[in-house]
Amino acid sequence: MSIDWSRIYPTGMEEEPNRQGLEFYWNIFRELKKYNIEPLVTIWHGETPLYIENELLGWANRKTIELFKKYARTLFEEYKGVVHYWLTFNEINNALMFLNLLPTESAANDAQRTFTLLHHRLLASAEIVQMGHAIDPENKIGCMICYGESYPATCNPKDVIADMELKQMQQFYCSDVQVRGAYPSYSNRIWEKYGVQLDVTAEDRAVLKAGTVDFYSFSYYCTSLV
């Protein structure tokens, strides 16, 4: 199940959470407990408050990280001892899977924005993993990847390499950061290919290293040939 950020902080800018929103999920958790169902809760499932999207440009703005941390802290503290299993972002790699799906004249700008917002989400994930463990050491916090298996169309080395590079970008780029705590070496090739310049500071790298997830989860839809 997922919790909707805007139910808890309607604009994202409020200092105090919406109590009615918190109670809405309390009712769900009480019902789950009645039937001995252990919830696995996704903190972000695409429901960034509209105000943040309109006024801050959403995850393209680093300020969104702090607002998300406020929201996540509220959940960890409110449902401590009730929820033990969390996912930071649902299908965090979707932004890469859909990159340039519909070619436009601004493809380079789309790539820069996509990799920038992903960097901010990966930082936010790492920060709230650390936060969740500090609030309740019993918390298990994982990542969630949209995974689609692919195979090279032939044994031609060009097809094999194309398949490998597709997997690296769409399937492994995000999960390598979340599981291993650092951008993989092949990320430099991907950034160069798309003309992307990321502002990755030494502090960012330390945050990613310290905030690795406890487990890996994925959704699976289909298999493809490359």
Name each model-derived stretch.
Residues W5:
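N-terminal cofactor/phosphate-binding cores enriched in small/glycine residues
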Residues T11-M13, E23-V226:
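Active-site region of glycoside hydrolase catalytic domains
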